[in-house]
Amino acid sequence: MGNNIKVTFNPDKIAAWWPAVGTYYTTTYPQNQSVFQPGIYQTTSLINPKNQQELDSVLINRYKQIDWNTWQGFPVDQKLPLVSRDPPLKPHINQSAQTFEIKPGPIIVPGIRDIPRGLVPPQTPTNRDQGRKPTPPTPPLRDTHPHLTMKNQTFRLQGFVDGLRDLTTTERYHNAYGDPFTTLSPVVPTVSTILSPPSTTGDPALSPEMSPSSLLGLLAGLQVVYFLWTKILTIAQNLDWWWTSLSFPGGIPECTGQNSQFQTCKHLPTSCPPTCNGFRWMYLRRFIIYLLVLLLCLIFLLVLLDWKGLIPVCPLQPTTETTVNCRQCTLSVQDTYTPPYCCCLKPTAGNCTCWPIPSSWALGNYLWEWALARFSWLNLLVPLLQWLGGISLIAWFLLIWMIWFWGPALLSILPPFIPIFVLFFLIWVYI
């Protein structure tokens, strides 16, 4: 009989009432509308069941043979009946028996209970059996706290859902009476197994771009910038004091603010208020000082880039030369030198004279060669520069510190010895 239930009964007797597969009325005219409820079933055939208990015992025995956690013993091709609100066809009066066949339908998940899946316990007789007006069906209660019972049912739900995943199909099924024009969608009640964390109010939400570490780094950077800015202002003020002192060898006098529209109190020329006539000159000196400091920073940056070899400048007098085709001038020549290469500006017969750019101090060599070409006396400083270049970095820092600390005191002592130092230098160079 395939995957369907066939229950044969005498139309003069109430044969069976089973919510899992449907409600059957065997009278000539049913007083109550039949309601076919969903359920999981196996092929079952009963001829004229005597009472409800007989049908219950047969179906319960069938359902007990199935392990609903692993779905062992349940045929893979078993389907569920569709929900139909239509009553059975009205039987003929002279008909001795009638067979209802429920065809397969989409899977509908049964309720989560502590009984085998698909088996719904028989209901007690209601007022419908006594001829009263049927009461409307009560909608199922909504589970407002699914997380309270989720822990005990997670394992059982997992096996049940795995079985449903194997049985679910997307084909179009007929309804309980074989009507091909009605297709009912399955209703699958699910319980979420993922609990969302409790949301807190009042806490500021930090974006991924503004993490605590980046916020601390920003604050530290602002402090460093503020510290450097105060130091720059201090350096500018000290340089302004030194520049002003050049005009007053005997000492910087106080600015009384006379000859101005607004009388001001006495102050120094390096801190004139906006109402003083010396205010514009003070800021002009500060502006020139800032430009000089910026120029020093640029010179330091150029020296650093030239030392790293990031300023490719061709030397004026190359030490090594290579003559190759002009098309290959920027390529390596027998892997002797590393690119890039420099070419002459006037090629002869399609050939270029190429020489490599120094890997370090290219700009310095170019400027030095340019100065030697115009000032020949600079060759006398070559030994001194070579000697200074051989001094270690620690010796340089020590020399700078000694000049900074003892320089002002030595200015009054060294002038008598300067001619002797010049004589010793000339002897050391030419002898």
UniProtKB/Swiss-Prot annotation:
Glycosylated residue positions: N351
Keyword Oxidoreductase annotated: no
Biological process terms in GO annotation: caveolin-mediated endocytosis of virus by host cell; fusion of virus membrane with host endosome membrane; virion attachment to host cell
Compartmental location: Virion membrane
Listed GO CC annotations: membrane; viral envelope; virion membrane
Topological region Intravirion: 2-286, 236-286, 401-406
PTM comment, free text: Isoform M is N-terminally acetylated by host at a ratio of 90%, and N-glycosylated by host at the pre-S2 region.
Region: Pre-S, residue numbers: 2-207
N-myristoyl glycine: lipidated positions: G2
UniProt region (Pre-S1), positions on chain: 2-148
Main localization of the protein described in the UniProt heading: virion
Pre-S2, as annotated region: 149-207
Region (Disordered): 115-146
Keywords for this protein: Acetylation, Caveolin-mediated endocytosis of virus by host, Fusion of virus membrane with host endosomal membrane, Fusion of virus membrane with host membrane, Glycoprotein, Host-virus interaction, Lipoprotein, Membrane, Myristate, Transmembrane, Transmembrane helix, Viral attachment to host cell, Viral envelope protein, Viral penetration into host cytoplasm, Virion, Virus endocytosis by host, Virus entry into host cell
UniProt cross-references to Pfam families, sorted A to Z: vMSA
Topological domains annotated Virion surface: 2-214, 308-379, 430-431
Family: Belongs to the orthohepadnavirus major surface antigen family.
Domain remarks: The large envelope protein is synthesized with the pre-S region at the cytosolic side of the endoplasmic reticulum and, hence will be within the virion after budding. Therefore the pre-S region is not N-glycosylated. Later a post-translational translocation of N-terminal pre-S and TM1 domains occur in about 50% of proteins at the virion surface. These molecules change their topology by an unknown mechanism, resulting in exposure of pre-S region at virion surface.
Function: The large envelope protein exists in two topological conformations, one which is termed 'external' or Le-HBsAg and the other 'internal' or Li-HBsAg. In its external conformation the protein attaches the virus to cell receptors and thereby initiating infection. This interaction determines the species specificity and liver tropism. This attachment induces virion internalization predominantly through caveolin-mediated endocytosis. The large envelope protein also assures fusion between virion membrane and endosomal membrane. The middle envelope protein plays an important role in the budding of the virion. It is involved in the induction of budding in a nucleocapsid independent way. In this process the majority of envelope proteins bud to form subviral lipoprotein particles of 22 nm of diameter that do not contain a nucleocapsid.
Protein name, entry field: Large envelope protein
Originating organism: Woodchuck hepatitis B virus (isolate 59)
Lineage, highest ranks first: Viruses, Riboviria, Pararnavirae, Artverviricota, Revtraviricetes
Gene that this sequence comes from: S
